[in-house]
Amino acid sequence: MDTIFALATAQGKAGVAVIRLSGPRAYHTACLLAGPDLPSRGLSVRQLKDSQGARLDDGVVLTFAAPASFTGEDVAEFQIHGSLATTEAVLRCLGDLDGLRLAEPGEFTRRALENGKMSLPQVEGLADLIDAETEAQRKQAQAVLNGALGQLAEGWRAKLIRAAALLEAVIDFADEEVPTDVSPEVRALLAEVRADLEHEIAGVRIAERIRTGFEVAIIGPPNAGKSTLLNMLAGREAALTSEVAGTTRDVIEVRMDLGGLPVTLLDTAGLRETGDLVEGMGIALARRRADQADLRVFLTEDVDAMGVELQPDDLHVLPKADQRPDTANAISGVTGQGVDQLVQRISDVLKTRSSSAGIATRERHRVAMKTALDALDRTGTVLESGPDLYDIAAEELRTAIRALESLVGRIGVETLLDEIFASFCLGK
């Protein structure tokens, strides 16, 4: 097994940089740079030197003996001054040593997974935590990283293994002292797991939206003030504004944190009949993105004139509050009048939806759980035929168990791992 190393902190100038090593030569390498009397596990303040004895930097050296480390291997970390030159000097020194190589993206975490220090959902949770931009995303990622989904899946798996064992007992030991009617307990176990799976499957879409972000489309006729409103919400000139109708022809996206939730605001082309080919393409795109959005804000005097059917959660506000005597339910992107109230309304709708989110956060999770649920449905149907078909019921249970094992990364995930770890930095 190679010993790997990489910069664990962000590239660039910083107060502190952390360089991580993992593998059989991690401790030996730490001693080469920091002195021979390092503890096998602990913290030391040392002067780091290269192979010629030249001083590299003063820093903190952390050592972790296997298996009590992040990767499950011997691990060492150098906490040094974060200048580009200092970091490069230490990395260059490590690269010149035999038996060491630069880590691939996510390789430290991959070793943690392979050594049983993390489950696949925890790896996904770590990736999401690194990418988290809002409080809701942080909390969601922390729950998965702390093992919430893995614990659920292991609990379901244990119940299904118990159910399968009961059926196998009837099949293999029918002539001995084994209860002949195990179906009540089996059905009870299936019902418990089935209810949990249905609940989690129902919450995946919203949970995934929290992970990736909600889309909120601003819709209205030309010159209603959509781009001005977008700029007001973004706090910058994200969209070009003009008195000329039809200025916006593409969909302009602005990412923002709205009450702790990740939201992408979409400024769309004004909806109207037009003979301009390019504007017409923009309007068609606007309609498609509006249909796909999680929430739509209609900024218009007359929604019916938009040719779009209102959905229950759609919001309708009147434009240009600064130019009308009655400002009820009206906003102005110029003065900001009514904008805070609109933001609160958007936030309330999305927070209400978010309350139904489950722990599972990805389409992969949903597919695995749906596969298990379908197998449980087939199991229940087969059980109706009595003990003669218990062998088929047991096989369906094994299908469900395998689906749950794929959920936590026990089987069939090699291609998926390559995709996940490609998104990690070298030091993770």
UniProtKB/Swiss-Prot annotation:
Binding, Mg(2+): S227, T248
Any one GO MF annotation of this record: metal ion binding
Gene Ontology annotations of biological process type: tRNA methylation; tRNA wobble uridine modification
Binding site for GTP: 223-228, 242-248, 267-270
Gene3D superfamilies for this protein: P-loop containing nucleotide triphosphate hydrolases, Probable tRNA modification gtpase trme, domain 1, tRNA modification GTPase MnmE domain 2
UniProt enzyme class: hydrolase
Principal location: cytoplasm
Binding, K(+): N223, S242, V244, T247
Binding site for (6S)-5-formyl-5,6,7,8-tetrahydrofolate: R20, E77, K117, K428
Database matches in InterPro entries: G_TrmE, GTP-bd, GTP-bd_TrmE_N, GTPase_MnmE, MnmE_dom2, MnmE_helical, P-loop_NTPase, Small_GTP-bd
Record-listed E.C. numbers: 3.6.-.-
Transmembrane spans: none
Domain TrmE-type G: 213-351
Domain of life: Bacteria
Entry keyword set: Cytoplasm, GTP-binding, Hydrolase, Magnesium, Metal-binding, Nucleotide-binding, Potassium, tRNA processing
Cited function: Exhibits a very high intrinsic GTPase hydrolysis rate. Involved in the addition of a carboxymethylaminomethyl (cmnm) group at the wobble position (U34) of certain tRNAs, forming tRNA-cmnm(5)s(2)U34.
Family: Belongs to the TRAFAC class TrmE-Era-EngA-EngB-Septin-like GTPase superfamily. TrmE GTPase family.
Subunit: Homodimer. Heterotetramer of two MnmE and two MnmG subunits.
Protein name per the record: tRNA modification GTPase MnmE
Species of provenance: Ruegeria pomeroyi (strain ATCC 700808 / DSM 15171 / DSS-3)
Gene from which this protein is expressed: mnmE
